[in-house]
Swiss-Prot record:
Entry protein name: Small ribosomal subunit protein uS17
Keywords recorded for this protein, A-Z: Ribonucleoprotein, Ribosomal protein, RNA-binding, rRNA-binding
Subunit structure: Part of the 30S ribosomal subunit.
GO BP of this protein: translation
GO terms for MF: rRNA binding; structural constituent of ribosome
Cross-referenced InterPro entries: NA-bd_OB-fold, Ribosomal_uS17, Ribosomal_uS17_bact/chlr
A Pfam family reported for this protein in Swiss-Prot or TrEMBL: Ribosomal_S17
């Protein structure tokens, strides 16, 4: 079975070597066909602490690293804005 890969946004980087990545899943409602958006948060391993809040990252499924970590950050696709830049 192939390992799953997902793309999401880093929403928290307050832990050491761990980031929380929010992945948005969009799908049509089975009856009404309205597009529904669901967000799932995954804890992912970031060995070098490269990721910051707002970064767009790709995560890949991995063997369990801790009680809640089952994903690893493979690469940073887009760097997020710094908080001072976002305020302008």
């Amino acid at each position: 079975m192939a390992l799953k890969e997902m793309v999401g946004t880093v929403v928290s980087d307050k832990m050491q070597k761990t980031v929380v990545v929010a992945v948005e899943n969009r799908f049509p409602h089975p009856i009404y066909q309205k597009i529904i958006s669901r967000t799932t948060r995954y804890k992912a391993h970031d060995a070098e602490n490269h990721c910051k809040v707002g970064d767009r990252v790709r995560i890949k499924e991995s063997p369990p690293i801790s009680a809640h970590k089952r994903w690893t950050v493979t690469d940073v696709l887009v760097k997020g804005m710094k908080s001072k830049e976002a305020a302008k």
